[in-house]
Amino acid sequence: MARSFVGWMTLGAVIVLSSTCALAQTTQKAQVFPLRDTVGLIATKAKMDPVTYLGRPAVRLTVEGEDGDGIAILPGTDFQDGTIEAEIALKPTTPPGVRYPGFVGIAFRSRDASHFEMFYVRPGNSAAPDQLQRNHAVQYVAGPDFGWYRLRREWPSVYESTGELAMETWTKLKIEVAGRTAKLYLNGSSKPSLVVDGLKGEDLHGSVGLWSFTNEESYFSNVRITPAAAMKLENGSDVAGVWELQFGGDAGGGGATMELRREEDKVTGTWSGPLGTGREITGTWRNGYVELIFAGEWPKDSRQGAPGPVHVHLAGWIDGNTAKGRISVVGRNDGQWSAKRKE
């Protein structure tokens, strides 16, 4: 039964193994990679050089070819939760006068060169005259399925943000990961530049890597990985059942019931709540991660616009008998949802 309604609503890879792994310690202690040389590094589609850049030793990565990106996997890393710190810099190699935002970042929980979570930055967007470009200075992605284009189109402004950055300048990054949440900090700030509540990657642990793009020189130095006690999580929870759900956003919130069924990776069911009763749900399931859609009806008593048909999109993780994620009523409201399975 519906509850009351309140006012609502890829990757071409470069794999680099750092020779500084001799300084890496066990996963229970901090692992430090100064990246002072290229001894033992293994590269694909990239040229690597040990350099001194802006006064500090670093590894420079340049991606071979006219288009593509690359990831540098640090050996001996098996990261789940904790902190990753690094210093990065970027120098564009495009002709003078060509606008280039730049792309350089840190990947984590990497299974291989195409499956990973990642934060990257676009220093050239930080001081752009167009505010829209400024809003695209910091980015989260999850390969191979959730690139920047898909995330921006499906969840505008959720997985990218502004940030104080500059070309040809060392930037300190800090990534904090706890379960399905990750935060990115810039240059020692106590406030995160981007918070991702609901990481979309397929794996709960994996390697840490350095990421670069074509038309630039990317520099990396002083990577430090500090593990923390891992949150107890397990992928693969089923979505089938009756779910009591709460949701909300800037335009308000409410409650609903979802009755869901799953056959392999296909999900079907119904939604009953403020946006309609018995509305047909379709979607997908991937190892506990779900994407659900249905056609709803914006309520007549809402103060947030005229009534009419709406498209609703939910995405999130099932963890045992609980679930949470993001909800979008396209063009009307965006927010979060959480649910419990009725037993």
Model-based region annotation:
Residues 233-343:
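Central antiparallel beta-sheet cores of small beta-barrel/beta-sandwich binding domains
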Residues 8-20:
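Bacterial N-terminal signal peptides
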Residues 3, 109, 224, 262, ...:
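Basic side chains
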Residues 25-238:
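Extracellular glycan-recognition regions
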Residues 1-7:
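N-terminal secretory signal peptides that target proteins for export/translocation
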Residues 10, 25-27, 150, 157, ...:
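Intrinsic disorder/low-complexity segments enriched in polar/charged and small flexible residues
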